[in-house]
Amino acid sequence: MSKHKVSPATIARNKRAFHDYTILEKFEAGIVLQGWEVKSIRAGKVQMIDSHVHIKRGEAWLFNCLITPLLSASTHVVADASANRKLLLNRREIDKIMGRIEQKGFTCVPLAMYWKGPRVKVEIALAQGKKVHDKRQAQKDKDWAREKDRIFKKAHR
């Protein structure tokens, strides 16, 4: 039997990113974690609400991703729940992201954290901030799609 629990399930999602930004391009990145962090992630103690990605000295870093330590897992280590974590990307991907971030109005945000085999992966995206009227229009479009589905569902009964 496999030693690791294999689950394709998403660990955490950053729903606010889809509301606040227009997603342009997605990337899959590995993440450097300590043992207690992996145990906390397995327990689902992750929050990505105000997380963002910065590129410093040619390396991608995940900021403000809160991984709450388990009381039983981090007894001998001082656990920093909101520590900055290094993301693992190819040089081409980092250069591409860095080139777009330097343009005005573009940023890089994490969208989700998930298991891929025994490893934790982070889905990050190049994004552009939405204006207030864009957010309103997106909400109207979602409401109309929901209403349209209801109408079709009633018509097919």
UniProtKB/Swiss-Prot annotation:
Residues 135-157 have a biased composition (Basic and acidic residues). GO terms for molecular function: RNA binding. It is found in: Cytoplasm. Residues 133-157 are annotated as: Disordered. Its main location: cytoplasm. GO terms for cellular component: cytosol. Belongs to the SmpB family. This is SsrA-binding protein. It comes from Francisella philomiragia subsp. philomiragia (strain ATCC 25017 / CCUG 19701 / FSC 153 / O#319-036). The lineage of its organism: Bacteria, Pseudomonadati, Pseudomonadota, Gammaproteobacteria, Thiotrichales.
